[in-house]
């Protein structure tokens, strides 16, 4: 699965650019959100036939493999200009954009996973919901994440370089709202908006790295981001356990507030950085004399 994700984003970054690349990266995230929801339900159904049957979902990997062979060209994209003679000799290079956004994605997914696993305990400790209701409401974020992926390309054209910061800021506010919520309706709205904001920020990061990376390094860039994502998810429980132990508070509300403040710090740093960047200028038209 990790190889598929990295390759999919790399191919989009190599074969497409600009608005078309943004739109396809959004579609990739939308498809991932939809598949996560559908296959989670499918695995739950297959569990009734025994846990061995749950691994049957991996047989569906034949579908993208077949479609890839039928529809994706095996030809290297045409490169114009002076880079034509050098593209074949270029080697992957690590750049500051990859490192910076890799750290960003690590922290973001530490907080994302930390938030999702604390929803059920939060509902139960606050006394307004059950674990089953928390599971149902959590599914809303996947649905809004799908919507975010579909409309990502259009929103990216409006928000530009502020896309990542504003998406992260909206997510931070929603986590803090969730930590203070006392009813299912407000919690559902907060989770829905969080899914939408998260679904905007993540593809924007992939797009930003692709835009700042040469063709030979596209696969390296997407791989670094995906490794950061997986490490963030893996280490998230340990990070929040360490924080809870340090402050002597193991409640879900405390963890959720720490989560929100961490995401808020990411948002502030990102927005300040974006505001200091010079906007890209469109080339001036050449007038005939």
For the regions a protein language model found, what residue spans apply to each?
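Symmetry-related core transmembrane helices of the 12-TM Major Facilitator Superfamily/SLC fold
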Residues: 54-70, 255-273
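Helix-to-loop junctions at the C-terminal end of transmembrane segments
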Residues: 148-160, 244
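C-terminal transmembrane helical hairpin of 12-TM major facilitator-type secondary transporters
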Residues: 160-205
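A late C-terminal transmembrane helix in Major Facilitator Superfamily
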Residues: 212-249
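Intracellular juxtamembrane helix-capping segments at the cytosolic ends
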Residues: 4-16, 200-214
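Helix-loop-helix hairpin linking two adjacent transmembrane segments in secondary transporters
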Residues: 19, 27-73
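Extracytoplasmic gate region of multi-pass secondary transporters
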Residues: 97-139, 145
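Cytoplasmic helix-loop-helix junction between adjacent transmembrane helices
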Residues: 1-31
């Amino acid at each position: 699965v990790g190889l598929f994700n990295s390759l999919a984003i790399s191919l989009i970054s190599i074969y497409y650019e600009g608005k078309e690349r943004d739109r396809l990266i959004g579609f990739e995230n939308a498809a991932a959100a939809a598949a996560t929801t559908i296959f989670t339900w499918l695995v739950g159904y297959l569990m009734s036939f025994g846990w061995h049957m749950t691994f049957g979902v991996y047989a569906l990997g034949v579908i993208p493999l077949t479609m890839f062979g039928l529809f994706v060209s095996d030809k290297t994209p045409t490169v114009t200009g002076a880079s034509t003679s050098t593209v074949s000799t270029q080697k992957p290079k690590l750049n500051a954009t990859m490192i910076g956004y890799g750290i960003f994605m690590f922290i973001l997914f530490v907080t994302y996973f930390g938030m999702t696993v604390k929803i059920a305990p939060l509902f139960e400790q606050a006394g307004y919901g059950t674990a089953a209701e928390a599971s149902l409401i959590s599914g809303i974020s996947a649905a809004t994440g799908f919507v975010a992926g579909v409309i990502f390309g259009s929103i990216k054209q409006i928000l530009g370089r502020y896309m990542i910061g504003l998406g992260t800021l909206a997510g931070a506010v929603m986590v803090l709202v969730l930590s203070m919520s006392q009813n299912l309706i407000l919690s559902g709205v907060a989770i829905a908006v969080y899914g939408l904001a998260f679904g905007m920020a993540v593809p924007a990061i992939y797009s930003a790295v692709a835009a700042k990376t040469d063709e030979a390094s596209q696969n390296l860039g997407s791989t670094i981001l995906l490794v950061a994502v997986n490490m963030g998810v893996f280490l998230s429980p340990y990070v929040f356990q360490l924080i809870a132990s340090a402050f002597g508070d193991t409640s879900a509300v405390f963890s959720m507030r720490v989560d929100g403040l961490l995401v808020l710090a990411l948002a502030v740093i990102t927005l300040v950085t974006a505001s200091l960047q010079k906007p890209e200028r469109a080339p001036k038209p050449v007038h005939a004399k």
